[in-house]
Amino acid sequence: MLNQLQSLTEYVGGNNALIDQWLQARKQLLVAYYHLVGIKPNKEALSLLDEEALDNFCQNLVDYLSTGHFHLYEKMLHEAATHSEQLLALSTQLDFALQSNTQQIMTFYDNHLATAIDHDNCLEFQQALSSVGETLEERFTLEDNMIRLVYDN
């Protein structure tokens, strides 16, 4: 996911300050996720759950989702509307898919990430965390498509 982000950053970087900030927020979210799941350079084994890493990831996650829905998507839809009806229609479809994706992530958050972790639900938590990663990957693909759609036209 970081490679995909790097590619997009190189593609649109510097052309729009809002998009640049958004992509930087995505990078922070990914780093927080990787830290939480134990993906670190030069690390040999997974460690026990780091509560601070969980808190950091959850905060980054909620901030990222909020920024997308309450600031960026609306601006991108407005930008799409200035180009053409077809572009607006495609962007609106992506926006609906992103809303559904947000709902999935928030369900994971409410059911697994926001609750205390103990030995009884550790495996369930790890599975939920993996699902969140997969859902984030889907989200980033949708967002990348929206960015490219709007900024290629």
Curated annotation (Swiss-Prot):
<keyword id="KW-0963">Cytoplasm</keyword>
<dbReference type="GO" id="GO:0005737">
    <property type="term" value="C:cytoplasm"/>
</dbReference>
<keyword id="KW-0804">Transcription</keyword>
<dbReference type="InterPro" id="IPR038309">
    <property type="entry name" value="Rsd/AlgQ_sf"/>
</dbReference>
<dbReference type="GO" id="GO:0006355">
    <property type="term" value="P:regulation of DNA-templated transcription"/>
</dbReference>
<comment type="subunit">
    <text>Interacts with RpoD.</text>
</comment>
<dbReference type="Pfam" id="PF04353">
    <property type="entry name" value="Rsd_AlgQ"/>
</dbReference>
<dbReference type="InterPro" id="IPR007448">
    <property type="entry name" value="Sigma70_reg_Rsd_AlgQ"/>
</dbReference>
<protein>
    <recommendedName>
        <fullName>Regulator of sigma D</fullName>
    </recommendedName>
</protein>
<dbReference type="InterPro" id="IPR023785">
    <property type="entry name" value="Sigma70_reg_Rsd"/>
</dbReference>
<comment type="function">
    <text>Binds RpoD and negatively regulates RpoD-mediated transcription activation by preventing the interaction between the primary sigma factor RpoD with the catalytic core of the RNA polymerase and with promoter DNA. May be involved in replacement of the RNA polymerase sigma subunit from RpoD to RpoS during the transition from exponential growth to the stationary phase.</text>
</comment>
<comment type="similarity">
    <text>Belongs to the Rsd/AlgQ family.</text>
</comment>
<keyword id="KW-0805">Transcription regulation</keyword>
